[in-house]
Regions:
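PLP-dependent class I/II
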Residues: 1-225
Length: 225
């Protein structure tokens, strides 16, 4: 079972209560089917959580958990694909899974990070970039979307927001936005038509400039709203 929290594209963060319920469901299904079920927890946005909260770890609630992490988000190094898979020590066959994980990158050679970047990351394991800029950007963008009449859930983390498009065809909606220098991702790419994803992992100044473009887009293309 693969989970992604904090979630791309919605920005949702699963609560401890949700993860406990998931863990109980997995325990029940393991007994029902008579074999182990593993959770692969995709956690590249772990530090990007808003309102002073911290994201819970599913491995605290479920033994058979593999946690996948990437430094590309916490250190603002999106071009450097470097991270790790943490095997819960209480996981079934943990002694076999650890060496298996270490062999994966060797088998897919182009995913191997350079020695230089590995040494660099080792020196900053407990450091992060300034994560507060994402919350500032999110609040600016969310408030403007609500002001313009979009239906949108306020993100709890990541640097994405996932509003409902102003027409059923999200692809057409995003294509219209291009005329206003707004690059949006239609939700069809995520198997959920009718929405679009916006990213705000940029300078706050650029987010502010985009708000005017967003308003022009909506008022010009959808004047009856």
């Amino acid at each position: 079972v693969l989970i992604n929290t904090q979630n791309n594209p919605s920005g949702a963060v699963y609560s401890a209560e949700t993860l406990k319920k998931l863990a109980q469901l997995m325990e029940d299904k393991q007994k029902e089917y008579g074999h182990d079920i593993f959770i692969i927890s995709d956690e590249p946005y772990r530090e990007i959580v808003f309102d002073g909260k911290k994201a819970p770890y599913v491995s605290k609630f479920y033994d058979n958990t593999l946690s996948c992490y990437s430094f590309s988000k916490s250190l603002s190094l999106p071009g450097e694909r470097i991270g790790y898979v943490a095997v819960n020590p209480t996981c079934t066959d943990a002694d076999l899974l650890v060496p298996m994980m270490s062999q994966i990158s060797r088998g897919i050679g182009h995913n191997c990070p350079s020695s230089l970047i590995m040494m660099g990351v080792e020196d900053v394991l407990d450091e992060t970039s300034d994560m507060t800029v994402y919350e500032t950007n999110m609040n600016l963008l969310y408030d403007k979307l609500i002001e313009l009449g979009f239906s949108c859930v306020r993100p709890s983390g990541t640097f994405y927001i996932f509003p409902k498009a102003l027409e059923e065809d999200a692809v057409a909606f995003c294509n219209k936005a291009l005329k206003y220098d707004l690059v949006l991702v239609p939700s069809d790419s995520f198997g959920c038509p009718g929405y679009f994803r916006m990213a705000y992992c940029i300078d706050t100044e650029k987010v502010v400039r985009s708000l005017d473009a967003l308003e022009r887009f909506v008022k010009t293309e959808y004047p009856d709203r």
